[in-house]
Amino acid sequence: VLIIAVLFLAASELVTADYTRDEWQYRAASLRDAMRNFRDTRCSPGGEVCTRHSPCCTGFLCNHIGGMCHH
């Protein structure tokens, strides 16, 4: 009976640890996506002016000489 109890507790710990790791991975992915979305809401699209406070949207580069976003 004692061996069964120890095995049950060990299995419970493994399941809980696995669930917690998955939950943290999900939260990390959600935070990463939220940060991407936040950056893209304040970005300048192609052909628009880019500054330090308004960088180019994902996929565009800022030409700092002219201050315009381009591919």
Curated annotation (Swiss-Prot):
Residues 18-42 form a propeptide. Pfam families: Conotoxin (PF02950). GO terms for molecular function: ion channel inhibitor activity; toxin activity. Coiled coil: none annotated. One of its GO terms (cellular component) is extracellular region. Disulfide bonds join C43-C57, C50-C62, C56-C69. Keywords: Disulfide bond, Knottin, Secreted, Signal, Toxin. It is found in: Secreted. Residues 1-17 form the signal peptide. Expressed by the venom duct. Its main location: secreted. The keyword Secreted applies. The presence of a 'disulfide through disulfide knot' structurally defines this protein as a knottin. Belongs to the conotoxin O1 superfamily. This is Conotoxin LvVIIB. It comes from Conus lividus.
